[in-house]
C-alpha cells in the first residue's frame, strides 16, 4: 500500500458544527463550475466558491440542518440547492441569479429578502441523508430521504398546471415511496449507450437508464448488525459499453471493512483496514473515466482504491468531523478532483487537483522505455536502448550513486 502526500490545498473559515451529510459539492449557481455547500447545526447554509476563505453565499434555514444536496429536484433543467433539517423542514434555494451579484454585497445583506428560501415545506422529521435521482426511470428526478429510524421515503415535486413560478409547487410523497426495515437502497446509474458524454457531478440530465439494487442485510450476512454501514453506487467503470452491462457499488463499515460489488451482488474485492471508516465517496483521480472508491476514517486516514484493488492512502493531519470528495473549482477556472475535510478547529480544508498518473505500482524502467525522449538521451550517451542491463546500470548510478553522465 503506497502513501501519498498532497500539498495543493486551501483553507476555508467555518465556525459552526455540522452533521456528516450536511456537506456536498456541485454546481449550485448553474455556472458550470462546482461549489462547496455546507449546512450547520444553527441553520446556516453556506456556499463556498473558488479559493475564497469566506462563504460566497449565506442563507438562513429553520432548525439544525442534517443534510444538503444539489440537483434538479424541480425538473426545470437546472440545479437547485436543497437543505433539510432534523425537525423536518425542507428548504429549496435557487442560486442561479446569485452568481451575478457581487460577493461583498452577499455578506452585507444577510437578512434581506434575497436570503430567504424559494420554498419551504414540512416533511417527517429526523432526516439523516437525502438523494436527488430518477428512481423510477420516468426521466424526472425524485427526492429520496433516509431517516434515523431506518425509514426511506421518496417525494416528487409537483406543480399546478397554471403555475407561474417554481415556488407554487410542493413535495408529494410517492404512493410506493416508503420502505422500512434494515435495508440498504442504492442507486446504480448505467451509462447511456447512445454515446452522449457524461456530465460533471450534480449537472442536470447527466444520468442515463438506471436500475435499483436492494440488499436485505440479514444477520447472517453482516459481521455486526450494530456497526454503521455506508454505501455508494453509480461507480463509473470507464467506457460506456462496460458501464452499461452492470453498475458497481461499494460499501464500508465502521469496523474497517471495504467492499466493491456489482449489481448481481458478486464481490469483486474486499479490504480490511485498521481504521474506523465513517465516509465513503467516489472520485476519478486518474482521469481515465473510472471512478475510484474513496473512504475516510475519523483520524484523517483516507484510502483510495481502484477496481483492481490497488490501494493508496493519504493521511490528513487532523481528526475529521465530516468528509466529501468530488469535483470543485478552486483555481485555474475549471473543475478538478478534490478531497474536502471538515476539522474540529473551525476550518475546512480542500485538497484540489487530486490526481494520479496511475493507481497501480509499476517499474520505473518500463515507464521510461515508453518515452521517446528517454531513448534519445540513451542514444546521445552511447547506450543501447535494447541492452536492458546497461540501461538498468545507468539509471541506478544516476539515482543512487549520483554519478555525472
Describe the role of every protein-language-model region:
Residues 1-405:
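Beta-propeller-forming repeat regions
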Amino acid at each position: 500500500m503506497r502513501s501519498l502526500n498532497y500539498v495543493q490545498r486551501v483553507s476555508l473559515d467555518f465556525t459552526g458544527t455540522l452533521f456528516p451529510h450536511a456537506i456536498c459539492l456541485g454546481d449550485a449557481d448553474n455556472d458550470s463550475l462546482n461549489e462547496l455547500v455546507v449546512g450547520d447545526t444553527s441553520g446556516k447554509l453556506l456556499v463556498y466558491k473558488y479559493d475564497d476563505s469566506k462563504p460566497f453565499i449565506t442563507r438562513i434555514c429553520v432548525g439544525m440542518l442534517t443534510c444538503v444536496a444539489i440537483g434538479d429536484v424541480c425538473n426545470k433543467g437546472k440545479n437547485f440547492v436543497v437543505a433539510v433539517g432534523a425537525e423536518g423542514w425542507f428548504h429549496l434555494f435557487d442560486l442561479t441569479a446569485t452568481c451575478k451579484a457581487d460577493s461583498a454585497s452577499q455578506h452585507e445583506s444577510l437578512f434581506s429578502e434575497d436570503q430567504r428560501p424559494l420554498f419551504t415545506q414540512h416533511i417527517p422529521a429526523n432526516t439523516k441523508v437525502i438523494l436527488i435521482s430518477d428512481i423510477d426511470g420516468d426521466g424526472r428526478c425524485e427526492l429520496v430521504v433516509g431517516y434515523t429510524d431506518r425509514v426511506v421515503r421518496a417525494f416528487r415535486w409537483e406543480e399546478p398546471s397554471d403555475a407561474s413560478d417554481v415556488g407554487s409547487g410542493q413535495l408529494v410523497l410517492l404512493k410506493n415511496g416508503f420502505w422500512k426495515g434494515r435495508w440498504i437502497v442504492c442507486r446504480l446509474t448505467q451509462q447511456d449507450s447512445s454515446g452522449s458524454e457524461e456530465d460533471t457531478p450534480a449537472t442536470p440530465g447527466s444520468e442515463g437508464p438506471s436500475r435499483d439494487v436492494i440488499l436485505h442485510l440479514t444477520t447472517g450476512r453482516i459481521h455486526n448488525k450494530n456497526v454503521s454501514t455506508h454505501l455508494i453506487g453509480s461507480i463509473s467503470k470507464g467506457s460506456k459499453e462496460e458501464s452499461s452491462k452492470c453498475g458497481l457499488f461499494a460499501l464500508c463499515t465502521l469496523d474497517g471493512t471495504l467492499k466493491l460489488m456489482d449489481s448481481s451482488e458478486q464481490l469483486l474485492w474486499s479490504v480490511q483496514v485498521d481504521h474506523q471508516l465513517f465516509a465513503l465517496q467516489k472520485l476519478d483521480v486518474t482521469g481515465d473515466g473510472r471512478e475510484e472508491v474513496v473512504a475516510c476514517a475519523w483520524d484523517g486516514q483516507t484510502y483510495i482504491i481502484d477496481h483492481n484493488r490497488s490501494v493508496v492512502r493519504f493521511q490528513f493531519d487532523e481528526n475529521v468531523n465530516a468528509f466529501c470528495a468530488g469535483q470543485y473549482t478552486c483555481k485555474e477556472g475549471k473543475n478538478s478532483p478534490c478531497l474536502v475535510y471538515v476539522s474540529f478547529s473551525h476550518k475546512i480544508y480542500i485538497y484540489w487537483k487530486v490526481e494520479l498518473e496511475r493507481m497501480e505500482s509499476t517499474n520505473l524502467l518500463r515507464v521510461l522505455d515508453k518515452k521517446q525522449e528517454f531513448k534519445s538521451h540513451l542514444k546521445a550517451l552511447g547506450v543501447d536502448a535494447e541492452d536492458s542491463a546497461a540501461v538498468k546500470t545507468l539509471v541506478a548510478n544516476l539515482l543512487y550513486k549520483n554519478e555525472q553522465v
